[in-house]
């Protein structure tokens, strides 16, 4: 049995609590002989700043580069609001993405039947929802140069951000989306603003070319990003895989997140390119929710997004799709039983702590694997 190297980076706030539930699951998989994971732990974000005055140390970056996958908790909090910008907690995550070459962000939005009434939309609009947003992560307006604020005099300033995309960046993110669609419902919707942005014109052109040349059997639709946002809240189940740029992906994935009822439910994956020789890719998996410092240490955090993120690691880094399916099924079974953490609690359901939810999911997984 192959040994897989995992680096656990719990981070700040509720990060260590929810990571503890993933570690419980990993330990059981190892002891049951189902998989063989070798885990190491490091500091990132505010915890790294407190220890080393950086957002991630060189030692932990080296661990990250050597790992088969990174499981990441959350970073940030008011405690570090005044630290220098270049070592702010979020800079640790940005460096991980940059140094590992993580260009594709996968954000599934799945609505479990037991939580359909927790969504802001009607049950019929979201029940059975299962969409995947593929966001380009390393290009676009967040990284384009120049990025400046200039003093024009007379009390006036000018801010400049630059939206930049090269053909290869669009091609590789398009391939990720099409490859995912082939394993799902075989449909990709590409979203941009070609009506007002030159980068949108190129995006549309390149995605169309990749589709025609390499994936003619996959259905491709194009939609303006603002219209796409409207349709996400009107009838989200029309979508399967949505592929879009960094800025629009940031916005659209957060819109999709709230369709499911709680940010505490949603995982994500950030993937690099497949290495030609090893056939492996660098990858980081993290929950969509933040560090929630207001509830840290109280046992109130929902560990489902963190556990689901580990499930994505099983699927995309270790080719353990069947085991990932069982993790998803275990979560669905626990929710169907009426167990709820505070963020998804409703009348007639049973309140659970972080640990109780994690233990319940592990018990269901053990049943499914018996």
Curated annotation (Swiss-Prot):
Record-listed substrate binding positions: 97, 107, 135, 226
Gene symbol of the encoding locus: leuB2
Co-factor: note: Binds 1 Mg(2+) or Mn(2+) ion per subunit.
The organism's place on the tree of life at top rank: Bacteria
Enzyme Commission numbers on file: 1.1.1.85
Catalytic reaction list: (2R,3S)-3-isopropylmalate + NAD(+) = 4-methyl-2-oxopentanoate + CO2 + NADH
Protein known as: 3-isopropylmalate dehydrogenase 2
SMART domains on file: Iso_dh
Localization: Cytoplasm
GO molecular function: 3-isopropylmalate dehydrogenase activity; magnesium ion binding; NAD binding
Annotated positions binding Mg(2+): 226, 250, 254
Root EC class: oxidoreductase
Biological processes annotated in GO: L-leucine biosynthetic process
Function noted in UniProt: Catalyzes the oxidation of 3-carboxy-2-hydroxy-4-methylpentanoate (3-isopropylmalate) to 3-carboxy-4-methyl-2-oxopentanoate. The product decarboxylates to 4-methyl-2 oxopentanoate.
Subunit (UniProt): Homodimer.
Residues at the site labelled Important for catalysis: 142, 193
InterPro entries in UniProt: IsoCit/isopropylmalate_DH_CS, IsoPropMal-DH-like_dom, Isopropylmalate_DH
Pfam assignment, any one: Iso_dh
GO cellular component: cytosol
Residues that hold NAD(+) according to the record: 77-90, 290-302
Family, as annotated: Belongs to the isocitrate and isopropylmalate dehydrogenases family. LeuB type 1 subfamily.
Pathway of action: Amino-acid biosynthesis; L-leucine biosynthesis; L-leucine from 3-methyl-2-oxobutanoate: step 3/4
């Amino acid at each position: 049995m192959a040994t897989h190297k995992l680096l656990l980076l719990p981070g700040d706030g509720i990060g260590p609590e929810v990571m503890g539930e993933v570690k419980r699951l990993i330990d059981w998989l190892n002891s049951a002989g189902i998989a063989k994971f070798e885990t190491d732990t490091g500091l990132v974000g505010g915890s790294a700043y407190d220890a080393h005055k950086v957002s991630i140390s060189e030692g932990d970056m080296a661990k990250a580069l050597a790992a088969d996958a990174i499981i990441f908790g959350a970073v940030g909090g008011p405690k570090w609001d005044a630290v220098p910008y270049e070592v702010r907690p979020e800079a640790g995550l940005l460096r991980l993405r940059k140094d590992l070459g993580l260009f594709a962000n996968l954000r599934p939005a799945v609505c479990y039947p037991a939580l359909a009434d927790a969504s802001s939309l009607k049950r019929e609009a979201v029940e059975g929802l299962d969409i995947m947003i593929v966001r380009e992560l390393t290009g676009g307006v967040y990284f384009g140069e120049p990025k400046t604020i200039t003093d024009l005099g007379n009390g006036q300033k000018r801010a400049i951000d630059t939206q930049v995309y090269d053909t290869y960046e669009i091609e590789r993110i398009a391939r990720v989306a099409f490859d995912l669609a082939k394993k799902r419902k075989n449909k990709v919707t590409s979203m941009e603003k070609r009506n007002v942005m030159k980068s949108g014109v190129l995006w549309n052109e390149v995605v169309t070319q990749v589709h025609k040349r390499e994936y003619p059997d996959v259905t491709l639709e194009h939609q303006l990003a603002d219209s796409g946002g409207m349709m996400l809240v009107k009838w989200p189940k029309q979508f399967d895989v949505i592929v879009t740029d960094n800025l629009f992906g940031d916005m659209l994935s957060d819109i999709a997140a709230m369709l499911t009822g709680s940010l505490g439910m949603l995982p994500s994956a950030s993937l690099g390119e497949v290495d030609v020789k090893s056939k492996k890719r660098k990858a980081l998996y993290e929950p969509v929710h933040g560090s929630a410092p207001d509830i840290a240490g109280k046992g109130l955090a929902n560990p489902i997004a963190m556990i689901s993120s580990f499930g994505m690691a099983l699927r995309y880094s270790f080719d353990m799709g069947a085991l990932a399916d069982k993790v998803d099924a275990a979560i669905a079974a626990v929710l169907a039983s009426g167990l709820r953490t505070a963020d998804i609690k409703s009348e007639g359901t049973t309140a659970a702590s972080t640990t109780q939810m994690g233990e319940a999911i592990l018990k269901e997984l053990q049943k499914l694997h018996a």
